[in-house]
Amino acid sequence: MCGSALAFFTAAFVCLQNDRRGPASFLWAAWVFSLVLGLGQGEDNRCASSNAASCARCLALGPECGWCVQEDFISGGSRSERCDIVSNLISKGCSVDSIEYPSVHVIIPTENEINTQVTPGEVSIQLRPGAEANFMLKVHPLKKYPVDLYYLVDVSASMHNNIEKLNSVGNDLSRKMAFFSRDFRLGFGSYVDKTVSPYISIHPERIHNQCSDYNLDCMPPHGYIHVLSLTENITEFEKAVHRQKISGNIDTPEGGFDAMLQAAVCESHIGWRKEAKRLLLVMTDQTSHLALDSKLAGIVVPNDGNCHLKNNVYVKSTTMEHPSLGQLSEKLIDNNINVIFAVQGKQFHWYKDLLPLLPGTIAGEIESKAANLNNLVVEAYQKLISEVKVQVENQVQGIYFNITAICPDGSRKPGMEGCRNVTSNDEVLFNVTVTMKKCDVTGGKNYAIIKPIGFNETAKIHIHRNCSCQCEDNRGPKGKCVDETFLDSKCFQCDENKCHFDEDQFSSESCKSHKDQPVCSGRGVCVCGKCSCHKIKLGKVYGKYCEKDDFSCPYHHGNLCAGHGECEAGRCQCFSGWEGDRCQCPSAAAQHCVNSKGQVCSGRGTCVCGRCECTDPRSIGRFCEHCPTCYTACKENWNCMQCLHPHNLSQAILDQCKTSCALMEQQHYVDQTSECFSSPSYLRIFFIIFIVTFLIGLLKVLIIRQVILQWNSNKIKSSSDYRVSASKKDKLILQSVCTRAVTYRREKPEEIKMDISKLNAHETFRCNF
């Protein structure tokens, strides 16, 4: 609600100011608007709460703030409060004519307009901190542009069939492009890769002919060669293409981006015309090297983005890196060049993924032997001229642009996305919002450029910052532009006509508690080298650096200082009978932390609400009394222990006792309790562990033996079922089976008496083992 109200409030000011009705009617209208919107009653009135001591500092707080320059303006009978929103200043008795409130102006000169595609060509904007300005930018595409089309072809061996197709594209393409342009020109250039290892073979037999292994006559590899400047002579173009030979390299990626940058920036060599639509057609079937790839060849010098053609050959190919995508995009946009990637094979998607990073580019897939090349160029051109996008160049520090495109079909899109399907009869509008957040920006440029991508016209936006007041310039006698309650005579200087601050004499560093800390702890403003702290509804902010307050103390159960104390400088000052960092503990609770020696937590902790919290992590116990590894007082003063029994001591030792050990004579006491837990006999512990281990082992052996005996007993019982007994008279007939004898032992084998008559077995029953 507050944001929309403020926007409406500011917009009304701008409109009224542009009507030039004078300051009185303007500020009276501002007062009415602020009363209606209730801004004067808002909880977050940063104007009044800031304690701004000058008009400039007041206006820098936000677009709703005004400054009263009236000399006798007094609020509350104590001191001047000149910074507030307009409605409050008027209600406090400040006359309308005495209120400083610079408005936002957008000035569009109508005379001397030379642009035909982008209007207005120039805009002048006056801004104040926190305010924003709006204007409309119109872009109207022309019907028949002059067109410059430059073919940049990958002439590696795999592109042989596509290069042959170029011999016949000239006339056919000229006829098709005549529908879109009355003035069409063609140019040609070739590229391969950097002529160093590992990109090409440097073998003596292959250095000049990379195709020698295939019995082909190839031209030497090269980074980029400009073959033919842009010309209307189609026959000359076809002859240049016909003379072109293929070349070769080793690795798969090519040096396309290197060649593209040179073709873009070498304007005079290529013959780019300022008034023409510039198209760069890149034909390839492989990816391109990116920045840093050339480090593999020991090339570490970054690409400088300049033209380096000598005799139409790129001479820095082996000494400078490939350009980055960002650098390439910048050079293409700066030179108004649209790129068409004509890619054959599976690498088409690689280039398609790059389109969002290269504004004004299109990718198309060419068929075998480039049969669809002309149609691809025509379709790409139609798409390019039907898209209208803008971007901001030459950004001004501290100034922010928000651009929305209003397309012919009524849809709204972000400026970088732009509009599509725009015809030569359409007009695209761009709603431009310019915002300045603060005034503490010095130096730099004071204008920005809004550039439609691919167009040769731009809009220049001049920015003027309203960061000072008229009273500080020439109107104000003493007291109008400043609040003297914050200042001293060394900083605040006035003459008969005006007052000003000698801010160079007082550095803001004096308002910092430390060089890494914000000015006035971020809770005040630095005026004449002193902090003026903000007024906050939560409480009082004070201190030399506004570092103290009476509201940021810790809470306990929802109450500041548990309700048992007051907050001073961020620390709780407890009432009588209470203690603790939050005043949450009764003072009597401290008695529960005193040990038998009268020490609080044995000197190794702090008492928190009747319980010891050991500060030494080695201490344990209710009173932190146990600390096996602590360095005890006896150890620290062991050399002085003999002073407690001075008999038979030498004079030197007695002198030492009187000096370094004198304090101990007054404070010593005998501690009869052990610092450590009582330690049992190690030998006894050893024998106990040994006996227990032995008994456990013996028990395991007995259990295992019993299990084995039980298992054997069960097996003997089961074998008794197979006893065989026979009388001497009986005859046992053996079956024709083969058996093996198995011998095993047991503790008490049971005898088995068997009487088996012998039989003569037939040979067929004999067993062979």
Curated annotation (Swiss-Prot):
Gene Ontology biological-process entries: cartilage development; cell adhesion; cell adhesion mediated by integrin; cell migration; cell-cell adhesion; cell-matrix adhesion; ganglioside metabolic process; hard palate development
Extracellular side, ranges: 43-684
SMART domains recorded: INB (SM00187), PSI (SM00423)
Disulfide-bonded cysteines: 47-65, 55-469, 58-83, 68-94, 211-218, 266-307, 407-419, 439-467, 471-491, 471-494, 481-494, 499-528, 511-526, 520-531, 533-546, 553-567, 561-572, 574-583, 585-609, 593-607, 601-612, 614-624, 627-630, 634-661, 640-657
Ranges for domain VWFA: 146-384
Superkingdom: Eukaryota
Domain PSI: 46-95
GO cellular component terms given for this protein: cell surface; extracellular exosome; focal adhesion; integrin alphav-beta8 complex; integrin complex; plasma membrane
Primary location class: membrane
Cytoplasmic compartment residues: 705-769
Transmembrane segment boundaries: 685-704
Family annotation (InterPro entries): EGF-like_dom (IPR000742), Integrin_beta_N (IPR033760), Integrin_bsu (IPR015812), Integrin_bsu_VWA (IPR002369), Integrin_dom_sf (IPR032695), PSI (IPR016201), vWFA_dom_sf (IPR036465)
Domain I-EGF residues, every copy: 471-495, 499-547, 548-584, 585-625
GO function terms (MF aspect): extracellular matrix protein binding; integrin binding; metal ion binding
Residues that hold Ca(2+) according to the record: 193, 249, 251, 253-254
Protein's cellular compartments: Cell membrane
Membrane topology: Single-pass type I membrane protein
Carbohydrate attachment residues: 233, 402, 421, 431, 456, 466, 648
Keywords for this protein: Calcium, Cell adhesion, Cell membrane, Disulfide bond, EGF-like domain, Glycoprotein, Integrin, Magnesium, Membrane, Metal-binding, Receptor, Repeat, Signal, Transmembrane, Transmembrane helix
Role this protein plays: Integrin alpha-V:beta-8 (ITGAV:ITGB8) is a receptor for fibronectin. It recognizes the sequence R-G-D in its ligands. Integrin alpha-V:beta-6 (ITGAV:ITGB6) mediates R-G-D-dependent release of transforming growth factor beta-1 (TGF-beta-1) from regulatory Latency-associated peptide (LAP), thereby playing a key role in TGF-beta-1 activation on the surface of activated regulatory T-cells (Tregs). Required during vasculogenesis.
Domain-related comment: The VWFA domain (or beta I domain) contains two cation-binding sites: the ligand-associated metal ion-binding site (LIMBS or SyMBS) and the metal ion-dependent adhesion site (MIDAS). Unlike in the other beta integrins, the cation-binding site adjacent MIDAS site (ADMIDAS) in ITGB8 is not functional due to the presence of two Asn residues instead of 2 Asp residues. This domain is also part of the ligand-binding site.
PANTHER family: INTEGRIN BETA SUBUNIT, INTEGRIN BETA-8
Name this protein carries in UniProt: Integrin beta-8
